[in-house]
């Protein structure tokens, strides 16, 4: 029998409780994952009581309130607050999403917040995105065209060709989809994952790019592409409503067509 043991410092323990100092009109408890690698201690779940009557409507508003008024050491990423930049991607109430567009009212009971799953944690709710970005760089996500550029205009495309990019270019690389994918959890060192494969197809589908063959050859690998088993977590969790699984399927179809299948 195989015995699997977690490292001793991986067990999440109960952390500090920050109780309300005064009566609240709309009290709500927020439970947040805390981890600081510099302390060489187990991660914990800290509990904070906040007044929703004095807090904005989104989960990110609650985190900002906690950081500003209760515990300034709480660490998380955020920027646009409009679901555009992808900085505040995290696991909220068991689902990967963006804290800035997740309404508190959609959550019943305690608000439970963790970093994106199966990624190294820099601190608290901040995941290490370096491997994810390296995978993105590996697909060469820029227009590649070996023909001379037009002298008096940009490289143009028809309205119909432009529409082929809808549902692809909107990806904000938040990694919600990839970190919800069990195949990426198991083979993330080699499998590119839903987000990167959707981005790869974005350039394959672009009529202005003439490196389609080379791009497909680069993806034709048992691990890079074919670890996708259509589990569909990626499509379900995408905060932009995109369909990475569909894009992956199209890449597989194009490769099959190249081999006459």
Curated annotation (Swiss-Prot):
Pathway: Carbohydrate metabolism; tricarboxylic acid cycle; fumarate from succinate (bacterial route): step 1/1
Record note on cofactor: Binds 1 [2Fe-2S] cluster. Binds 1 [3Fe-4S] cluster.
Broad enzyme group: oxidoreductase
Keyword Oxidoreductase carried by entry: yes
Residue positions binding [2Fe-2S] cluster: 80, 85, 100
PROSITE patterns noted in UniProt: 2FE2S_FER_1, 2FE2S_FER_2, 4FE4S_FER_1, 4FE4S_FER_2
This enzyme's EC code(s): 1.3.5.1
Cofactor: [2Fe-2S] cluster; [3Fe-4S] cluster; [4Fe-4S] cluster
Pfam families per record: Fer2_3, Fer4_17
Swiss-Prot/TrEMBL catalytic activity: a quinone + succinate = fumarate + a quinol
Biological process annotations from GO: respiratory electron transport chain; tricarboxylic acid cycle
Keywords associated with the record: 2Fe-2S, 3Fe-4S, 4Fe-4S, Electron transport, Iron, Iron-sulfur, Metal-binding, Oxidoreductase, Transport, Tricarboxylic acid cycle
Annotated residues for binding of a ubiquinone: 186
Tagged with keyword 4Fe-4S: yes
MF-aspect GO terms: 2 iron, 2 sulfur cluster binding; 3 iron, 4 sulfur cluster binding; 4 iron, 4 sulfur cluster binding; electron transfer activity; metal ion binding; succinate dehydrogenase (quinone) activity
Binding site for [4Fe-4S] cluster: 171, 174, 177, 238
Family: Belongs to the succinate dehydrogenase/fumarate reductase iron-sulfur protein family.
Protein's recorded name: Succinate dehydrogenase iron-sulfur subunit
Organism listed in the record: Rickettsia prowazekii (strain Madrid E)
